[in-house]
Amino acid sequence: MTERAQTAPGRRTLLGAAVLGTAALGLPGTAEAAGRGAPDARGGGHGSYRDLPVPTVIGHRGASGYRPEHTLGSYQLALDMGAHIVEQDLVPTKDGHLVCRHENDITGTTDVAEHPEFASRRTTKKVDGVSLTGWFTEDFTLAELKTLRAKERIPGNRQENTLYDGRWEIPTFEEVLRWADKEGRRRGRPVWLYVETKHPSYFGGLGLGLEEPLAKLLRRHGRHRADSALILQSFEPTSMQRLSKLVATPRVVLLSGPKERPWDFVESGDPRTVADLVEPAGLKWIASFAQGIGPTLDLVIPRDGAGRLTTPTALVSDAHARGLVLHPYTMRNENTFLPADFRRGTDPNAYGDVFGALRVYFEAGIDGIFSDNPDTALIAAADFAKS
């Protein structure tokens, strides 16, 4: 029996709460007692994103290390474990609803292939220059998507998670907002959300732009202000620029490999790459419309040819010098995803020395981390805070 099977989610939750305390869990603290006022449990008036605990632990697609990603079950577990923020990725349906999926291709994360009534919807598309064959959210109405059920995306790595296949449907973002509002009222504090617009240029070209309907939902739920308990993010900087004109919610630009170009840059002919954006001039430009960056971990500490960590880059200090927070992605507990110097044993799906890896990244000065296993990251953050 593995350690994961021996430790129940409830035990993880209690341990995280006991170790971190109310401040790290985002509970009301001395600032409010001094007169800032009680936060709005719907997600507004909570104070700045800069008041979040550092390192901030972001539940990546919920607690996707333990449940099928982007389900209410995954979000609930991340929150119960004590994650400071819970992440959602947004894609549209054919009839314009925003739903929570990491990609518009739902072949690997739902049971759509088992629905004969949708067999003819299988098609090949080019999304951001990549040819994909499968089933896509923009070809389904919301009512049709609601007949599907979510499943584990990487069952080869996380066989235990397949136990929960078929348990949850695809949530709309509005359903998630209602869930967060309800949980906020129950807990007496806002539930922070981290919301990504996926492939905004692609969807804009289909007449399914993401920014306007997203802004409308944020205003409806009181999460459109600078002090709202929500952060927006995108790999396309122009999506954040558009949203900056619609809502005051904090914004983060996501950054992938150094040689890659954001797809909106490709379409507009902007020659800059991610390598250009992480230079001081690029960071200064990002700081003109965003409050942070979400770089891949390799932009913070590169790996060598053997997959081992090398020397940290200047990205943390350069970003901080321009007032930007850094929330890199993604930490996962399994050996196969860890730097080679923190893998343990020969089983790629066994857990490695995650605590050791997280300490190195925290020592580099990052402000937070996206993690599939928020309970692990919370304990690592508490260990780091005590050191």
Predicted segments, located by residue:
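Phosphate-group recognition and catalysis centered on beta-loop-alpha active-site segments
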Residues: T2-S387
